[in-house]
């Protein structure tokens, strides 16, 4: 029996009025059992069958919507105690109009697209994002109701803050006034179509009473003594983890008789505690500078052979350019390690000032120990190979490109995913995130305007990108102004109003346009996308002050903006030519005169969570795999690259399955036909770093840049060393996020093939070389690699 026939026979008779009946029934219906059986039948096919994947997702949505309130009246009755007062009152006041909006959405293409995103998308939405009641038979918020809740929250903030109301009115293009429902409908259109994708905290908590909407926090406490250390871990960090967010923690100042490993175990234990029976995982990343006397103990904390290793902790190191310069000159020379109690200025300084202080301390004999530079480098690389981390930051790049002078209070750490660059000081830095789904910006050339050979040819629409960025600025600022603050330090840090707007689906855009990831056309489009995004975000933020009468962010008077300078102008030789120079000049002059609402704008974060929901490639990365598997809270699910399989010709499917979707191993003519679907492991990582450098001037925070390496490349430490040195020479802020290694294993050899006629996976080429199967990003990366739902 075909999938279509199965659905018609077993599901066709389910009446529409059954929707919502399970809210009170509390038992599995015949429809649910039938649908679940079909899902189980489809799940073995979803890795390569786009229709099976879409059908499994639609069925899961149907099962779960039977557990959702059927009307907004029911919704308020169930979730009234959870919603904030303003949001609840707004829904009650506009209940009919909102109901009409939701009904229209369920008839729209946007809703169809959401249903067709596949099984993993449907599972992720209900497992992670929507509200639910407690108990053994929970009632769930529907996906449409979730988007409505967030949109209503944004509208409430617009009504409360004049500058946001002005921006909403400007976006809707109403010169005089705009109704509150018009704001909801406008924002809802972008969120529900997943053109603008909000970070997990926003989707889960916007509109909820006391909702904490920031994604990550950064702490830079003094840990010079035991009371200071305990205060940092329990007074500062614990409330942040309790708020279901990620934390970046600088431990470079750790200096007393205890070992850093004991301190890290305390952090690890807290993360483990807060993740116990927690729907949304939290995480913490500890950062240390490379000159610290306990750096080797720090790097050993996650090694698999360490019986006391910190399973739940992530790590990062901040390296001064001095280390790389000395290594390039003579790797056999000594690298000196210091106790921060005797070398406190090394934490505060960067650049020439750091170099001078380091040399002074060496001459004065203030060091604790020393080791050859090559030994320090090997220790770092050994840890990377075994654990996939620590993240690697370049201290000078973090500070030289910051929006204000940081000499004397240098930045030396980041957030949980190493894409946020802020100066915590005595406050707590805050990450407020969203991302633009770039494939939603693709448009088709109208056949009436061009010849038939160009009909249906896609192009990237920068106007659509600009509109989405403006909506993201509105949504994030609504969350900044309307979110709760777990600690006083967060409230102070939020005054900088730092945003992090990222992207997802860049690889899908290139593939749809027929570009290989490293083609010249891709490189140009990549850079232009980020220049356009940065300009639009800065201009919109400025207009919140200029036209909306908003107050500039705290500290703008001493920022580069007050001098009319932009982030890209701190990069030597950079010319922003996609946006005409006279527009940059006029904008800079106006900002210097009137101010700007936000301090930071773009960040390239890993979009693991929201990319699973949309089905597009994560962040700016090339495709991980064309067939992969994903472990959810309950099961392991095959995940297809939908963009790839939509392009696969029916006659080629047998070959695709035989080679596990690995284009690099296809026969020559198939390899050429599908060359734009090579994976990240097939591209030169040095060239991927070059691409990161090309977009870096327009990413004023940083980029979570991972290395994607085949296993044979990490057998020699020199390859990783050369990658780190290349990133240093390029001047990147984040040299490495994770080191993902493609191991020599095959998913195809293990998977159960639904079609008995499908060819078995041979596992080996004729010449005896290993034949890769479909790649599982979770298995390819180290065990430390998280599915970072904390940020996205």
From Swiss-Prot:
Disulfide bonds join 216-431. The active site is at 415 (proton acceptor), 417 (cysteine radical intermediate), 419 (proton acceptor). Its EC number is 1.17.4.1. Substrate binds at residues 200, 215-216, 246, 415-419, 606-610. InterPro entries: HSV_RIR1, NrdE_NrdA_C, RNR_lg_C, RNR_lsu_N, RNR_R1-su_N, Rrm1. PROSITE patterns: RIBORED_LARGE. GO terms for biological process: deoxyribonucleotide biosynthetic process; DNA replication; viral process. GO terms for molecular function: ATP binding; ribonucleoside-diphosphate reductase activity, thioredoxin disulfide as acceptor. The record marks 216, 431 as: Important for hydrogen atom transfer. The record marks 788, 791 as: Interacts with thioredoxin/glutaredoxin. It is an enzyme of class 1 (oxidoreductase). Residues 758-781 are annotated as: Disordered. It comes from the Viruses. SUPFAM superfamilies: PFL-like glycyl radical enzymes, R1 subunit of ribonucleotide reductase, N-terminal domain. Keywords: ATP-binding, Disulfide bond, DNA replication, Early protein, Host-virus interaction, Nucleotide-binding, Oxidoreductase. Pfam families: Ribonuc_red_lgC, Ribonuc_red_lgN. The record marks 737-738 as: Important for electron transfer. It catalyses: a 2'-deoxyribonucleoside 5'-diphosphate + [thioredoxin]-disulfide + H2O = a ribonucleoside 5'-diphosphate + [thioredoxin]-dithiol. Heterotetramer composed of a homodimer of the large subunit (R1) and a homodimer of the small subunit (R2). Larger multisubunit protein complex are also active, composed of (R1)n(R2)n. Belongs to the ribonucleoside diphosphate reductase large chain family. HAMAP family: HSV_RIR1 (MF_04026). NCBIfam families: NrdE_NrdA (TIGR02506). Ribonucleoside-diphosphate reductase holoenzyme provides the precursors necessary for viral DNA synthesis. Allows virus growth in non-dividing cells, as well as reactivation from latency in infected hosts. Catalyzes the biosynthesis of deoxyribonucleotides from the corresponding ribonucleotides. This is Ribonucleoside-diphosphate reductase large subunit.
């Amino acid at each position: 029996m075909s999938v279509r026939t199965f659905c018609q026979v077993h599901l066709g008779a389910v009446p529409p009025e059954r929707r919502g009946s399970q809210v009170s029934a509390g038992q599995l219906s015949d429809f649910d059992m039938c649908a679940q059986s079909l899902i189980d039948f489809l799940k073995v096919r979803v890795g390569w069958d786009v229709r099976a994947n879409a059908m499994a997702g639609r069925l899961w949505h149907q099962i779960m919507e039977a557990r959702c309130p059927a009307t907004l009246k029911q919704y308020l009755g169930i979730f009234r105690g959870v919603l904030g007062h303003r949001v609840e009152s707004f829904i009650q006041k506009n209940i009919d109009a909102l109901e009409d909006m939701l009904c229209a959405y369920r008839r729209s293409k946007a809703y169809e697209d959401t249903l067709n995103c596949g099984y993993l998308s449907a599972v992720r939405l209900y497992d992670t994002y929507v509200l639910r009641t407690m108990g053994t038979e929970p009632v769930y918020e529907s996906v449409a109701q979730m988007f409505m809740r967030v949109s209503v929250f944004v509208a409430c903030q617009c009504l409360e803050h004049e500058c946001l109301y002005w921006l909403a009115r400007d976006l809707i293009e109403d010169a005089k006034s705009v109704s509150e429902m018009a704001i909801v409908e406008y924002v809802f259109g972008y969120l529900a179509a997943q053109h603008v994708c909000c970070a997990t905290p926003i989707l889960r908590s916007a509109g909820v009473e006391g909702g904490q909407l920031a994604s990550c926090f950064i702490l830079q406490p003094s840990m010079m003594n035991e009371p200071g250390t305990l205060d940092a871990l329990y007074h500062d960090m614990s409330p942040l983890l309790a708020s279901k967010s990620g934390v970046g923690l600088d431990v470079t100042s750790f200096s007393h008789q205890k070992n850093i490993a004991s301190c890290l175990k305390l952090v690890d234990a807290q993360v483990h505690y807060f993740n116990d029976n927690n729907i949304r995982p939290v995480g913490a990343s500890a950062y240390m500078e490379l000159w610290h006397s306990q750096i080797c103990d720090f790097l050993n904390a996650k090694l698999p052979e360490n019986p006391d290793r910190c399973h739940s902790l992530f790590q990062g190191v901040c390296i001064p350019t001095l280390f790389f310069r000395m290594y390039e000159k003579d790797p056999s020379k000594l690298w000196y390690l210091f106790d921060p109690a005797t070398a406190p200025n090394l934490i505060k300084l960067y650049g020439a000032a750091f170099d001078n202080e380091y040399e002074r301390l060496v001459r004065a004999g203030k060091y604790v120990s020393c080791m050859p530079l090559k030994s320090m480098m090997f220790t770092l690389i050994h840890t990377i190979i075994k654990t996939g981390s620590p993240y690697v930051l370049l201290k000078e790049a973090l500070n030289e490109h910051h929006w204000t002078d940081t000499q004397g209070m240098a930045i030396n750490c980041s957030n949980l995913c190493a894409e946020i660059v802020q100066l915590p000081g005595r406050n707590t830095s805050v990450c407020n995130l969203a991302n633009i789904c770039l494939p939603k910006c693709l448009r088709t050339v109208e056949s009436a305007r061009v010849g038939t050979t160009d009909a249906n040819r896609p192009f990237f629409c920068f106007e659509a990108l600009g509109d989405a960025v403006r909506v993201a600025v509105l949504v994030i600022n609504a969350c900044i102004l309307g979110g709760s603050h777990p600690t006083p330090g967060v409230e102070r840090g939020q005054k900088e109003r730092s945003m992090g707007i990222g992207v997802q689906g860049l690889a899908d855009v290139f593939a749809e346009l027929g570009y290989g990831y490293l083609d010249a056309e891709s490189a140009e489009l990549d850079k232009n996308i980020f220049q356009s995004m940065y300009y639009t975000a800065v201009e919109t933020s400025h207009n919140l002050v200029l036209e909306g009468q908003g107050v500039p962010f705290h500290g703008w008077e001493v920022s580069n903006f007050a001098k009319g300078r932009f982030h890209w102008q701190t990069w030597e030789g950079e010319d922003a030519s996609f946006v005409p120079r006279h527009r940059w000049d006029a904008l800079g002059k106006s900002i210097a005169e009137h101010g700007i609402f936000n301090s930071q704008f773009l960040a390239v974060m890993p979009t693991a969570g929201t990319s699973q929901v949309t089905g597009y490639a994560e962040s700016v990365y090339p495709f991980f795999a064309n067939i992969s598997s994903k472990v959810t809270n309950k099961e392991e699910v095959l995940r297809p690259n939908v963009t790839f399989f939509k392009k696969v010709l029916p006659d080629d499917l047998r070959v695709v399955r035989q080679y596990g979707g690995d284009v690099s191993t296809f026969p020559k003519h198939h390899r050429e036909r599908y060359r734009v679907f090579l994976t990240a492991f097939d591209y030169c990582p040095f060239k991927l770093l070059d691409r990161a450098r090309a977009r870096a001037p327009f990413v004023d925070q940083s980029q979570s840049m991972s290395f994607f390496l085949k296993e044979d490349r990490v057998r020699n430490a020199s390859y990783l060393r050369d990658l780190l040195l290349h990133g240093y020479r390029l001047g990147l802020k984040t040299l490495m996020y994770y080191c993902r290694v493609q191991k020599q294993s095959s998913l195809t050899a293990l998977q159960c093939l639904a079609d008995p006629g499908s060819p078995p996976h041979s596992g080996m080429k004729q010449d005896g070389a290993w034949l890769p199967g479909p790649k599982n990003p979770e298995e390819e990366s180290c065990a430390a690699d998280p599915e970072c739902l904390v940020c996205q």
